[in-house]
């Protein structure tokens, strides 16, 4: 993936403003609520019976935080995103058997919570860079499936 200086600046700027402990749980909870079939991978997380249970679930919150920290690894290594996510790609495909389409669903939920957080600062240019970054992450997480 080729990154312009502007895209690098935008992506780093976005992530520097994010509170992972707040937005991670919101994004992951949203994914489990909006796309309930994604819950099948998280049966060990306990009560996922309804939106309130999901949003109050400590395991869901912890995983959401973990996801954003995982994205942060990509931000810090934008020139080697494939390398950053190679091990996670193998884990999700070979051991966990996660449907790779779910990565896109979660990335959409992350975009929504980031857009809500940034408000008017989430301009079309900002969104384009953010979507390009998330698209690269999704692509490389799904690499083992091909």
Swiss-Prot record:
One of its GO terms (molecular function) is organic acid binding. Residues 2-146 form the Globin domain. InterPro entries: Globin (IPR000971), Globin-like_sf (IPR009050), Globin/Proto (IPR012292), Hemoglobin_b (IPR002337), Hemoglobin_oxygen_transport (IPR050056). Red blood cells. The keyword Isomerase does not apply. GO terms for cellular component: blood microparticle; haptoglobin-hemoglobin complex; hemoglobin complex. One of its GO terms (biological process) is hydrogen peroxide catabolic process. The keyword Cell membrane does not apply. Keywords: Heme, Iron, Metal-binding, Oxygen transport, Transport. Heme b binds at residues 63, 92. It holds the Pfam family Globin. Gene3D superfamilies: Globins. Belongs to the globin family. Heterotetramer of two alpha chains and two beta chains. Involved in oxygen transport from the lung to the various peripheral tissues. This is Hemoglobin subunit beta. It comes from Artedidraco orianae (Barbeled plunderfish). The lineage of its organism: Eukaryota, Metazoa, Chordata, Craniata, Vertebrata.
């Amino acid at each position: 993936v080729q990154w312009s200086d502007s895209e690098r600046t935008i992506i780093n700027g976005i992530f520097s403003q994010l509170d992972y402990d707040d937005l991670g749980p919101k994004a992951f909870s949203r994914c489990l609520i909006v796309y309930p079939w994604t819950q099948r991978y998280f049966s060990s997380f306990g009560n996922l019976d309804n939106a309130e249970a999901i949003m109050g679930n400590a395991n869901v919150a912890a995983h959401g935080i973990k996801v954003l920290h995982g994205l942060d690894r990509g931000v810090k290594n934008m020139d080697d995103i494939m390398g950053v996510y190679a091990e996670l790609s193998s884990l999700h495909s070979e051991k966990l058997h996660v449907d790779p389409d779910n990565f896109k669903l979660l990335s959409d939920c992350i975009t929504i919570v980031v857009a809500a957080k940034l408000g008017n600062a989430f301009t079309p240019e900002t969104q384009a860079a953010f979507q390009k970054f998330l698209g690269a992450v999704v692509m490389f997480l799904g690499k083992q499936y091909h």
